[in-house]
Amino acid sequence: MRQIIIAGNWKMNTTLSEACTLVQSMKCELERIEGIEKIICPPFISLYPIKTMLENSSIKLGAQNLFYQEKGAYTGEISPLMLKELCQYVIIGHSERRAYFGETGQVVNQKIKAALQAGLLPIVCVGEKPEENENGQTRQVLETQLKEALDGLNLSCIIIAYEPIWAIGTGKAATASEANSAIGYIRRVLGDTLGNAAAQTSPILYGGSVNEKNITEILSQTNIDGALVGGASLKAESFVSICRQAAVIQNKH
C-alpha cells in the first residue's frame, strides 16, 4: 500500500502569530501519530518560523505556490531556490490559482519542472468545475489537465491531488465512490502518460470539504492515498483527528 499523505492547505489564513500558535497547539499530538506523511502548508511569511518550530520533527512543511524562475526581476514572486531552504513540498496548480491568477496548464507545467529541478516535491492539483461535472466532462477535463501538467516529464512518481472545484470550501464533498472513480481514472491517465510503474507508485489525494467526519470513508476507498485538507486544517483538533484516523487505516495494511 502507498503511504497515506495528509496535507493541510491553510490558504490565505493566519497571521504570523496565529500560525505559530496553531502549530504549537497540535505539534505534540501530530508527532505521536506514526505511519503517515503529515504536511502543513502555511502562508509564505510563516514558513521560516514554523520551520524552526518543527526542527527534527516528523511533520513536514509545504508552500502553496512558487514561480518557475530561480531569480530575477519578478516582483512579488517566490522562487524554488528560496523555498528549498524552508520546506519539502509545494502545491502547484490549485484551482484558486487557476481561477484568480490565470494559471494555465503550460504555467503549471513550468512550475512543476522548476520545483523538481530544485528538489521540491510538487503536489499537483487537478479538478473539474461544477458545470463540467454536470455535463459529464469530468474525465475529459482531468485528462487534459494532467497531460498539460506532465508534458515533457519523465517521472517515476508524482503526487496528484484531485479537487473537484464544486466541492472546495462548499461543505459538499464528493461522495467517496465519486472520488474513488475519478482518482481511478487519474491513475489510468498517469499510466498512459508516465507508464504503469509510475502510475502504481504515485500517491493520489482527494481534496474538497474533507473533515474529521468523512475522512475514514474517503481513505477506505481503494484508489485514494490521502487528502489535501482545507478549512479543517486550520483547527488543531480537527486536523489531528484526521491524521489519527488516517494512521489507523494505514496501520491496518
UniProtKB/Swiss-Prot annotation:
GO terms for biological process: gluconeogenesis; glyceraldehyde-3-phosphate biosynthetic process; glycerol catabolic process; glycolytic process. InterPro entries: Aldolase_TIM, TIM_sf, TrioseP_Isoase_bac/euk, Triosephosphate_isomerase, Triosephosphate_isomerase_AS. One of its GO terms (molecular function) is triose-phosphate isomerase activity. GO terms for cellular component: cytosol. Pathway: Carbohydrate biosynthesis; gluconeogenesis; Carbohydrate degradation; glycolysis; D-glyceraldehyde 3-phosphate from glycerone phosphate: step 1/1. Transmembrane segments: none annotated. It is found in: Cytoplasm. Its main location: cytoplasm. It is an enzyme of class 5 (isomerase). Involved in the gluconeogenesis. Catalyzes stereospecifically the conversion of dihydroxyacetone phosphate (DHAP) to D-glyceraldehyde-3-phosphate (G3P). PANTHER family: TRIOSEPHOSPHATE ISOMERASE. This is Triosephosphate isomerase. It comes from Dehalococcoides mccartyi (strain ATCC BAA-2100 / JCM 16839 / KCTC 5957 / BAV1).
